[in-house]
């Protein structure tokens, strides 16, 4: 959760909270790339980032909702070109760390929680899951 404090549910499957320190879109992108070991692209809204919404997968279209809930930026897996343009124009930062990159890191935690919830069912996390894309 990027060290977020005061975390609340966001958009059903995401979270919104306060970062330990104010940062920039680039600083957040660098921290995300290091934490997840992925490539990160960002649209810099040009404002300091303290409150962050996080949603795995494809949630670029949720940036308006994130902004309405007081977030300064949204970190997600996929963001369209036009979502990035609109958010940037509105002074809101969007970061895209890849669909795979934002979902696979939590797969083990989900498997553990499912196993605890359903002890009579054997839960197995796939080890063959891979990002379908190749990167330069």
Give the residues covered by each predicted segment.
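Hydrophobic structural segments
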Residues: 1-136
